[in-house]
Amino acid sequence: KLKTLNPDLHFKLLKTIEDKPSISQRDLAKELGVSLGSINYCLKALIDIGHIKLENFNSNPNKLGYLYLLTKKGLVEKASLTIGFLNRKKLEYEALKKEIDAVQDSL
């Protein structure tokens, strides 16, 4: 179900959920710069494949909220995605540095 999910988005989604388990879908969408519908789809898929689980909590007496918690499987996947994310960013950095150096050399 997540085969089409961008690896950077998948990583950022798991990282944000780990850092802010009580974040709302709306806030998650804003923080990651994607639509609310996309977040809803991704969260359902992450639950289906066992990367996260959903738990209820009462944030106040009149309101029911949810916690998104990474499972052991989700933590393993996040670790793998973190390595891939860092490798991609290092390559982007090296390419950008070469481009900057080339422009500076042409001045």
Language model features with spans:
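Short, cationic-aromatic polyanion-contact patches
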Residues: 2-9, 24, 55-79
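Alpha-helical DNA-recognition elements
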Residues: 45-49
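Key DNA-contact positions within bacterial/archaeal DNA-binding proteins
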Residues: 26, 37
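Short amphipathic alpha-helical interface segments
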Residues: 8-21
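Amphipathic alpha-helical dimerization/coiled-coil segments
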Residues: 76-107
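Alpha-helical residues within the helix-turn-helix
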Residues: 30
